[in-house]
Amino acid sequence: MSSQIRQNYSTEVEAAVNRLVNMQLRASYTYLSLGFYFDRDDVALEGVGHFFRELAKEKREGAERLLKLQNQRGGRALFLDVQKPSQDEWGKTQDAMEAALLVEKNLNQALLDLHGLASARGDPHICDFLENHFLDEEVKLIKKMGDHLTNLRRLAGPQAGLGEYLFERLTLKHD
């Protein structure tokens, strides 16, 4: 059944929004895996775990925002299978942060692609929505992860375990 409210909403943009929802949910799933990996008793980096669990929550909320947009525009939400994280054991914080940075760069590219598609299809509402709710936050998160990686690399070396512990305590400290 077609929507009575649908206007100037191309099927290509609708499909791209659904793909982006899936990517957000996959990112959330990955961050949930990371968050609970670092909270294990044999890893015990609670601050790192908290950082990734907060990201999981943010990505799930982003997916929900996109689903609300889909309904507001008269599109139909298609729930695709969410692929499991690429691994179960994440290693050191630096390895995990590198994996997370790759996830964010892929998400950012998908957002940019959707923005370009919406612009080409004459859909300023989608462009405005992405600019106000996603693009700036994504760039800030990529910068933050890049900064964390720089600091983790500085701390690597013969005492890498101590460096990782100090990074977790001093950078990712939370209440």
Curated annotation (Swiss-Prot):
Gene source species: Bos taurus (Bovine)
Cited CDD domains: Ferritin
Pfam families: Ferritin
A molecular function (GO) term: ferric iron binding
Function: Stores iron in a soluble, non-toxic, readily available form. Important for iron homeostasis. Iron is taken up in the ferrous form and deposited as ferric hydroxides after oxidation. Also plays a role in delivery of iron to cells. Mediates iron uptake in capsule cells of the developing kidney. Delivery to lysosomes by the cargo receptor NCOA4 for autophagic degradation and release or iron.
List of residues that carry N-acetylserine: 2
Name of the featured protein: Ferritin light chain
Keywords, sorted A to Z: Acetylation, Cytoplasm, Cytoplasmic vesicle, Iron, Iron storage, Lysosome, Metal-binding
Compartments (UniProt record): Cytoplasmic vesicle, Autophagosome; Cytoplasm; Autolysosome
Cellular component, GO annotation: autolysosome; autophagosome; cytoplasm; cytoplasmic vesicle; ferritin complex
